Amino acid sequence: SYAMEHFRWGKPV
């Protein structure tokens, strides 16, 4: 997964 790992609340965390 990429989005879940890099984007938690719509922000690159």
Curated annotation (Swiss-Prot):
Top-level taxon in the UniProt lineage: Eukaryota
Keyword line: Amidation, Hormone, Secreted
GO CC terms in record: extracellular region
Annotated GO MF terms: hormone activity
Modified residues (Valine amide): V13
Localization annotation: Secreted
UniProt similarity note: Belongs to the POMC family.
Protein name: Melanotropin alpha
